[in-house]
Amino acid sequence: MKTLLRGGYVVSGRGCRRADVLIDGEKVEMLGHIPPELAAQSEVVDVTGCMLFPGFIDAHTHFDLDVCSTTTADDFESGSKGAIRGGTTTVIDFACPNKGESLAYGLDLWHKKADGKCYCDYGFHMTIDDWNESIESELDAMFDAGITSFKMYLTYPAMMIGDGAVYRALKALKVRGGIAGVHCENAGVIDERIAELKASGLGADVVSHPISRPDYLEAEAVSRLLRIAQAADAPVIIVHTTNRASLDEIAAARRRGQTVYVETCPQYLALDDGVYYDPDFSSAARYVCAPPIRSQEDSEALWKALRRGEVQTISTDHCSFTLEQKDMGRDDFTKIPGGLPGVETRGEVVYTVAINENKLSLGGVCRALSENPAKLYGLYPRKGVIAAGSDADIVVYDPGASHVLHGADMLSKAGYTPFEGFRTNGGVSKVYLRGQLQVDGGKVVGGKMGEYLKRGKCAL
């Protein structure tokens, strides 16, 4: 039987309009006025007054990742379950082979981690932490497997590659129509600052984390990457962008005619660096991530850039650890596992701040959470839009379902949320994944029906 969502407002990147939505199997059949004869053959679901968003897409998650001598709290089962509960119907995680391992090995390993365990659809980026003829020879096979986006690091010794390797990789990806997202921080200077902080007796202070990784060292790496991309004549994505200085470097590159896409995250939009100054170690350590959370002024700059279309996507960089795992760094801040849970709360936090504080329109929220990620990562128009022929991935967002976020209520195994005590403006009521009801009344009612997505090329 078909499903008819009646009485809602369909949200797109252009705004919202009153429209009913008819679902047939996994696809949207039509929207607008549904003929009575079709309505009579359908299960009618009353969504009066609710916003109907295209399923949210989180293009930056780290599930079941070994890091800092431990493993993230969330695997693909718990991570994807939290994702679907929060309205995210697609995640794109990172396959991460170690240096010396093949890309094919990394892809196979991540399929073993994810296949058959996901409550939402999923895809992979491929991490490039080494560059040689062997790695380059594997690129065509990655594209055949539906991997068209890649990740590189300008920091972390175990994962970073040199500037020359970045240049060669960008050129190789451009030829194939691929694109790279890059983590931009200046590794060498950060290491020196860490050594200085420890020598001055501040090695156990959580606040040493943001002090060691200031905004200008992120901006320097952004600038360097963009000059490398200019030399390679290749597009790039700056992931988890946090500050005004980096945005200035990106604006300069665009004035030169470069193609640059920008991602930010809810923690950089709704929190500020005051979280690191809590005298209680556990309270401060839970916010340790890289790059660090920045100032209120940086948050305002990011919102302004979102309004102007200068930042295209909001992902989470979900990389969760329990507070017990965070305690590994009680005597040495560099041993605190870096990362936050966020995949379950992204939609509600972004919607609330955007609408309550007039930061972003409904259309802007849809572009950042759904439409632009789908276009950027080769999923549009199958995903990212409610239109005839698209997957029936639909978030029913009820403006009357406000609630307070508490870590104890989260599905994440981290056991906490960085947005503890945050009151939402409305909430996710129902979620459909390819036409099947996965969330009802804010509770996951469906199973592990997530499918692997072979993605096309960037169309943003």
Question: Where are the predicted features?
Answer:
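Histidine-rich, glycine-flanked metal-binding segment
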Residues: 1-55
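Metal-associated gating/positioning segment near the N- to mid-region
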Residues: 48-117, 134
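Short acidic/polar active-site loop segments enriched in Thr and Asp
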Residues: 88-90, 120, 148, 312
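His/Asp/Glu-enriched, well-ordered alpha-helical/loop segment
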Residues: 203-235, 286-287, 308, 312-314, ...
